[in-house]
Amino acid sequence: MEVPRLSQHISTPNSPCEEMIKNLSLENIQLCERDGNKSQDSGIAEMEELPVPHNIKISNITCDSFKISWDMDPKSKDRITHYFIDLNKKENKNSNKFKHKDVPTKLVAKAVPLPMTVRGHWFLSPRTEYTVAVQTASKQVDGDYVVSEWSEIIEFCTADYSKVHLTQLMEKAEAIAGRMLKFSVFYRNQHKEYFDYIREHHGNVMQPSLKDNSGSHGSPISTKLEGIFFSCNTEFNTGKPPQDSPYGRYRVEVPAEKLFNPNTNLYFGDFYCMYTAYHYVILVIAPMGSPGDEFCKQRLPQLSLSDNKFLTCTQEHGGLVFHQAQDVILEVIYTDPVDLSWGTVAEIIGHQLMSLSTANAKKDPSCKTCNISVGR
């Protein structure tokens, strides 16, 4: 979706943007300061006769758009020329102190048939709570407006990335994935106490848990998909897992075919960085027909097991051969329980590098490599 940049100097409701926004019924977009229930803008007069919007409805919500409609008293309805829409992130609903004044949350739209689509990645982010209120207005010949009182304030939350958005993100990840290297095991590092607890309280079986908030804010798997994190990247010179880890000094290594085989499906989950040169790709492996598989089918792009840029499983010489992308760090989520007896647990000889942990890591919203233009 192409969205024009906003003018750097937005002063009054009379100053239009340089271009109209595609698929957006907002022909003029600019700041319209609001304090309390009535507009205090110097170019706006107040007039009780204009109908006040009520029974506001929000529908067709995506990660960067929504439709809005409302009911109005028919009195003076034919005098309405514009709608003023006050859109704020929920935490800012009682404040008009904005860090970036060129990013409008007060929108002026020509009066069009309802519902009206509001779209724009420069003021809407995925999975974010917003408040919205509406005024009706009548533009006068001198450029001033007469306006109604503000409607009630309602709240809504934008959606996660769709498969279309994730496919765009995946294509950016494919561009830097690099050549494929062989690997033979998936591995997971934790503290010794973790593995002791698994043996004593879970019958030697690691259980899936909810994914944290790391990665893209709009990723549909964050805090929703249950799984177990594994790594598979290898050192270039040895072809083996690295000796260091940020997650603990004990490591379980599981033969790759135990988790990744023709009876599993593979999905792309996310692509992000943490203000460093390293980029991370999250992949999901789900046994066919499992609850995790059903979750991913509805939300994530599915990858071919044998032909993709990140992680492959191919049949060669009567056995399975595995490859992983060299130039990105793969984080693999396996959606079913894993028995420790499938592999081996041992202490690593390297160091625990806590600074490399991605637990609840925040994505760099300014990185051009791993962001798409539908929020961060």
From Swiss-Prot:
Signal peptide: none annotated. Pfam families: fn3, PHYHIP_C. InterPro entries: FN3_dom (IPR003961), FN3_sf (IPR036116), Ig-like_fold (IPR013783), PHYHIP/PHYHIPL (IPR042868), PHYIP/PHIPL_C (IPR045545). CDD domains: FN3. It comes from the Eukaryota. Residues 52-161 form the Fibronectin type-III domain. Belongs to the PHYHIP family. May play a role in the development of the central system. This is Phytanoyl-CoA hydroxylase-interacting protein-like. It comes from Xenopus tropicalis.
